[in-house]
């Protein structure tokens, strides 16, 4: 294997420092909020000089936006898992109930992850200052989740397993049955999320209530 040249080594060191800075900044933003986090703190926690931070990022706003966009971009793997569940072959009402339960449970688990809750809390707190970033977060997270559910409901409706006149509304209702109370509680009471058995109970109840309204 060829040894890395000076240019490649320099790029590697730069990438490492950039990662150190973004990791430290994310932890500080989540813990202290945007306004109470300084570039001095970020540099100290990252183990780099303040000049290095400013060499990578023009200002705190730029750093915050890049971090938030990067974190929301990591939602792809969760959506891939939800899509795989939603695309499970369904031919009977019982199949549909089981699939909805699995979809509800994975959806709940994803949103109840502490980093997800912390970032959502932070984005909401800074939405007035960063409206475009808040919009991006919504589009990449909650909206894509609703799009996925709506697509699955449409397919099941076409199979004759559901009768929902407004699929977007039905998707929103399913999402709230799954997330509503638990998410509200977790956002206001940090660290308090449903235990596994309770999550299973919520998922089953959400599927049952949804099918009671729209199942054929």
Q: Residue spans of the language-model regions?
A:
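N-terminal intrinsically disordered/low-complexity leader segments
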Residues: 1-16, 79-88
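Helix-turn-helix
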Residues: 20, 28-67
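Amphipathic alpha-helical packing segments from all-alpha helical-bundle domains
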Residues: 98, 109-118, 122-124, 131-158, ...
């Amino acid at each position: 294997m060829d040894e890395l040249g000076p240019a490649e080594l320099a790029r590697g060191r730069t990438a490492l420092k950039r990662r150190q800075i973004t990791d430290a900044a994310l932890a500080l933003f989540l813990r202290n909020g945007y306004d109470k986090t300084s570039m001095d703190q970020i540099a100290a926690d990252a183990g780099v000089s303040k000049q290095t931070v400013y060499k990578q990022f023009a200002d705190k706003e730029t750093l915050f936006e890049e971090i938030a966009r990067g974190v929301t971009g990591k939602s792809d793997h969760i959506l891939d898992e939800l899509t795989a569940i939603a695309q499970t072959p369904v031919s009977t009402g019982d199949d549909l109930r089981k699939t909805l339960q699995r979809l509800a449970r994975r959806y709940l688990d994803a949103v109840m992850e502490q980093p997800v809750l912390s970032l959502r809390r932070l984005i909401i707190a800074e939405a007035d200052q960063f409206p475009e970033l808040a919009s991006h977060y919504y589009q990449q997270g909650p909206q894509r989740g609703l799009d996925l559910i709506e697509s699955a409901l449409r397919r099941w409706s076409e199979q004759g397993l559901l009768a929902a006149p407004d699929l977007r509304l039905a998707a929103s209702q399913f999402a709230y049955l799954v997330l509503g109370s638990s998410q509200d509680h977790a956002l206001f009471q940090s660290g308090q999320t449903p235990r596994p058995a309770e999550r299973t109970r919520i998922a089953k109840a959400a599927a049952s209530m949804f099918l009671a309204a729209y199942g054929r």
